[in-house]
Amino acid sequence: MKYGVRYPRSGVHECPFGILQAQQIEYLAIINGVYGAKLVESEDGLHWREI
């Protein structure tokens, strides 16, 4: 399972260190005003779904 953060303008940023890194990046994005950042997961790295 792969985890990442989907940004409204730039797409998905894949987090190589897992879900904890993805959660931290989502939190930092929201603190810095990127309110559309969403935590996402993927099995193949191509099709992402929000969790």
From Swiss-Prot:
Name this protein carries in UniProt: Gene 62 protein
Organism of this sequence: Mycobacterium phage D29 (Mycobacteriophage D29)
Gene name in the database record: 62
